[in-house]
Amino acid sequence: GICVLGATLELASGQLLDDYLQTRFFQPMGVRASFYAGRLETEEVAALYGSTGVVQRTREQQTGQEIPTETGMGASYYPGGLTISAADLAKLVAILANDGEYQGETYLSPESVAAMETVQFAVSQEGTAPFDQCLILRRQDGLLGRNQLYYHTGSAYGVYSLLSYDPDTGDGVVVITSGAPWEVDDRGLYGLCARLSEKLYAAMEEHEI
């Protein structure tokens, strides 16, 4: 589905999705990221480790990735292929947490954010808590010490990640791990990511960050 969505956006804009994102979001926000790691410098990326300590992707393998030259050629990168730091991903999460704005600039309309947060259907899974599926985002009540959170998870080549934000307070947390064992908690979240996120939410409340 994300492959089709990415390719559709490319057809609509007449350019690679990554080029559109660079111009519309990444460059104005000071974000260094790309769906094509070949656009980044070797020193900007980290080696990716599996849970046994074996390297899954070296820095050179990542930055040696071929960069598509025509729309549609890079569609397979769009489901989970974004290379970005936790700090820069937090900037993108801030857009959602603040109804489309970041540092006084509007990047998405409030209506677009509301559409992304609209529940499409509920999902029940054996062994984990049910969640509401929105557009890309998921939502749960009583999660990580908050009344409700929107969130998105990701995993590839030893990386487990979790971004989340509280629509009531406008804050959020991003955790990206490499080399952690595969573990899913009773809420369906990667265990280490969830534990770190909960501690960070608690710290923000305690110190009013």
Segments from the language model and where they lie:
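Short, gly/Ser/Thr-rich active-site loops of penicillin-recognizing serine hydrolases
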Residues: 117-122, 128, 180-209
